[in-house]
Amino acid sequence: MDIDAPTDIAILSLTGLGGMRLQAYLRTLDLDVSRYRRVLPHFLDTKAQIVVAGRVGSHAWQYLERETACRVRVVSEERGMQAAGRDASGEARSLLAFHLREVGSARFFVELAELAGVACIDTRPLLAHLGVHASRADRFWSDLGCAEQIEEPFLREFTQAACEAPLPVLLGGHSLVSGGLMLLTEAAWREEDQRLERGT
């Protein structure tokens, strides 16, 4: 797993993976991983549904279909966006962004909660479609759910709405909706196995 964004660090912190040195460093950061922890039980629940959106590859979708008990709604869009330069040229298009522009951030997440109990969103295609040129720092603050730190007005509002949404929302980049979800799924099953071994 590439470490490209704070989401990746939070997931590695929660899962305990990445080696002793990395874990020792992560413990010094005192990261809030509560949003990620709230997502874990959904992967194991046959009645649960999750939404995964963004640059979702077929390998990630197949993994989720095979390794989770929940039902998965996938909105895969703008794969190869950066390599093709569609983000820089303004050609990127996102179904989620079309809807978001029509209903606004607060209603967007309320309606998302009617579809699923969890949302994992790669925000980069959405931002590219909307022409939001947020700094790397702002994108990373958004990934962490720290709306108050974000300077770009739309991204600040969107992130705040995600944090106040009636379902757990994980925001991030491409790795969230690929290797990140795989690690979270593995962590969910590992914790369930440990719970069963303890007999609780």
What name fits each language-model region?
Residues M1-T200:
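Conserved alpha/beta core of the MobA/IspD/sugar-nucleotide pyrophosphorylase nucleotidyltransferase superfamily
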